[in-house]
């Protein structure tokens, strides 16, 4: 669904899916099991003011089952990132500081690791340019010696709730700034690059 206001267009998608993995999906996941459950939520906010950046977040959970319907594997994935049309250094610092604060609550290596994955993933290879200024990206986050599945759930919930701390203060500063027709034209070009990434490189849309 889409909600629209004078300030922005907000695209939200949430879903729960049951089914059987395709052969290519089984090969990609390197599993012999095919029964699965997946759920997730995706949020994209496109401000109408070119001085305000695009916000994107995606959070998901995946389970695999054997023939007796026992869970044999489960993991979390997702992230959030920022795509400005015009760079304000303070906004970038603020967004990443919130990302780092959340990560540091769980593991001091998370921010560096997940930021690097975000920079690598959200890259328009055919133009050799970044889609935005990054954020966090993580996937296949399974229970391990330092993080239980409940810990991963708490981490993902914090990422989801971070919209209020990471993004809203930026919008409050930028949504009423003056802009020109030239600024709007540049915004359209950068939105076009955003669409290019989604159509050419985004694995969640390609597969």
Regions found by a protein language model. Give the residues of each.
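Single conserved hydrophobic/aromatic residue that forms the stacking wall/gate
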Residues: 1-7, 11, 207
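Long, hydrophobic/aromatic-enriched structural stretches that serve as scaffold segments
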Residues: 9-61
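Short, flexible loop/turn elements at secondary-structure junctions
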Residues: 16-18, 42-49, 61-63, 84-86, ...
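Glycine-rich, often proline-containing surface loops adjacent to acidic residues and nearby aromatics
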Residues: 37-40, 73-83, 129-150, 194-196
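Compact, glycine/acidic-enriched structural inserts
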Residues: 66-113
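Long, charged, mostly alpha-helical binding arms that flank functional sites
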Residues: 101-155, 166-172
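Extended, compositionally biased non-globular segments
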Residues: 145-204
